[in-house]
């Protein structure tokens, strides 16, 4: 589409559906800056994981994402780019009239994630321990997501990655107020609840959902909850929600 430059790319967290496509885009147009959630030089100590030890598709995908994370970071630096790990509390002007507020992860969360990553790789030679830690980190990874609130000329946009309802701890409730909410975790059942909807009070909700509903994305209960709070719903590819016109 004629895009010749990427000033900024954001990797919210290390899961296949959020990172592997970003690597493909970066190979075409390497970004000048990469935001992600780990110490910028940690990737250098991560050796490639052997996906053949995976016992199921989830483990295989997660190992691929971890490998692609290292490849992405190396690609950015090899092309003269900068890797950053924004922290909660920062507010950055990234373009005229556009500011980004970093809501999560906190320094504590970033350190915890780095510790989990290091422990995982240090156990790679003990298959049973490695796979146990792999599954545990996979289950927790969503709530290590980078959470951003954009403000463009007074319109606030909340982008929580795959954060579920338990992952907003430590964030000032006032900072969650937004006009547009990209519902977390693809609109699955744990992507929003009554309390979160009351805090955000969005007028519009965007849900990025898979069409096969394999992971129960765009869950009807979640969509109805947000619509009942007055939000207009905008969805990607997913089947109609019974009883609703989307």
Roles of regions detected by a PLM:
Residues 1, 6, 10-29, 109-218:
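Active-site-proximal loop/helix segments of hydrolase catalytic cores
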Residues 73-77, 172, 223-227:
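Class I S-adenosyl-L-methionine
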Residues 216-246:
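C-terminal regulatory/interaction regions
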Residues 14, 60-68, 214, 218, ...:
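Catalytic cores of large soluble enzymes that bind and process phosphate-bearing ligands
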Residues 20, 24-158, 236-246:
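Flexible, acidic/histidine-containing loops and adjacent segments that form or flank the divalent-metal
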Residues 43-47, 161, 224-228:
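An exposure/low-complexity boundary signal
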